[in-house]
Design a protein with these regions (language model features):
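Short hydrophobic/aromatic beta-strand element in the GNAT-like acyltransferase core
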Residues: 108, 121, 133
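Amphipathic alpha-helical "output/dimerization" segments
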Residues: 126, 144-165
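Short beta-strand-to-loop transition segments that serve as allosteric relay/switch motifs
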Residues: 132-143
């Protein structure tokens, strides 16, 4: 089964009520970690808090522990360069996260304690408005992220956008923030797109 079909099946199980939101996020982050080949994978959503706008972690899968782990909110006020890059460019590609201008601020409190060397964060949108991001993290040694990996995360966000909205808004303390207008030039498309070159062909062969 192709990556695209796997993502569709995970979303379909949530839509049919066969899994709950926690199981959905667990399955999704594990699958994306396998697709990208990274140590950790998380799903975050933009929220408004008493301390200002932030990214809140819905789930963070850590391959080293083979389970979901906790992650603190990331606040715009504390992480200006990171937020600015993520919003303006739609992604943060930091193969050397310990020295990248957008992520060096995480060095002492996040990167060093978790032995993380590389970060790849890519926004996903709902109805044209940035809603959250996928984060991929590499521990032990640096990993040179590729454009293909960036595109894979964007396609996952496009394909899973409605399921992500459903799962994220099922959390009582999560009120998603509409941070930017749909006309923003860095908005991402939310229409489904193939993850692999042959994904569309497979769908045509098997319409179910």
């Amino acid at each position: 089964m192709s990556d695209g079909r796997i993502i569709q099946e995970i979303c379909g199980r949530l839509d049919r009520g066969e899994t709950d939101r926690d199981q959905f996020f667990d399955q999704l982050t594990r699958t994306v970690a396998d697709m990208i080949g990274c140590t950790r994978c998380g799903v975050w959503v933009f929220v408004d808090t008493a301390e200002g706008r932030a990214l809140r972690c819905m789930a963070m899968y850590d391959r080293r522990l083979d389970r979901i782990v906790g992650a603190a909110d990331i606040y715009n006020a504390d992480s200006g360069p990171y937020f600015e890059t993520l919003v303006q460019e739609g992604c943060v590609v930091a193969s050397d996260a310990r020295h990248h201008p957008a992520t060096v601020g995480f060095l002492d409190n996040y990167l060093l304690p978790l032995d993380l060397h590389s970060l790849l964060d890519v926004c996903f949108s709902i109805n044209g408005v940035p809603f959250g991001s996928f984060s991929c993290e590499q521990a032990g040694a640096a990993l040179n992220w590729t454009q293909r990996q960036v595109q894979m995360l964007r396609h996952v966000g496009s394909r899973a956008s409605l399921a992500l909205l459903h799962a994220a808004t099922a959390t009582p303390d999560t009120q998603p923030a509409a941070l930017w207008e749909p006309s923003s030039p860095n908005r991402l498309l939310t229409m489904p797109a193939p993850l692999d070159p042959d994904d569309e062909n497979e769908r045509r062969r098997d319409p179910t």
